[in-house]
Amino acid sequence: MLESEVFDICYNINELILNSQMDTARTEVIKLLDRLNREGKEYSPMVNHFIREVGLFPYIDKNTASWQEQAVFEAYKTDLGGGEQKTLHSAQSRVLKRLLAGDNIALSAPTSFGKSFIIDAFISIRKPDNVVIIVPTIALADETRRRIEHKFSGMYKIITTTDATLRERNILILPQERSFAYVGKFESIDMLIVDEFYKASSSFDDSRSTSLLSAMIELGKIAKQKYYLAPNIHNIKENVFTKGMQFMRFTDFKTVITMAGKVYEKMGILSLIHISEPTRLRCIS
């Protein structure tokens, strides 16, 4: 990739930013970085500048960035627990700031957004006594447990079953059916986290909605703070389970892109197959 090509692409990205098309500009930056990575090229200071402009701070290359971009990379670095530190992107940082301020947040963002980083950072910084995390499946509960246990088992009792004895500080990671076992066992919960909260609506998941809605209402009564997550919700109508919560929507904040490709049969060209190829530059979530 010639320097002149990089310059032309960066010029177009700058035009998009000037015309308030930030989401499109971010997509073009990701495409540029993917191409540079595949060709084994370094990020120039100009490329690092536009990484910063679109808020993808974790992608900044400290080896080639100017001191301004290096400062941003360090400024957004956050403790995620267990000695792990990560640089958050701009949208993650906005959500974490609101949570640390005590706000109740309903967040809609794509899977690649890195919502789990925000949870870990909140626990590491705020150090709440009791956290309840409701997840859609037992498999996801186990996956979340492994992550949380690795970082916080020295400070908290990590609970995934219905018959555990509570300690002074607890993190419960449960499907909604199991969460009922702890209704009435807490005087208060410092943080209630619900993944895929939109499934409390019967229009999305009739089989899960009743038990999830009941769990959200009962545990929500004693929760000092709530953080609800969903992948692609564009708005929230007035309802009982998100009453009083602030809706933050980042459905267009992409940290990866999906490129459609076409695969033709060599013989006869009889079929056309559409494939989806996610392009991921570095691990965000």
How would you label these PLM feature ranges?
Residues 1-276, 280-285:
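N-terminal helicase ATP-binding lobe
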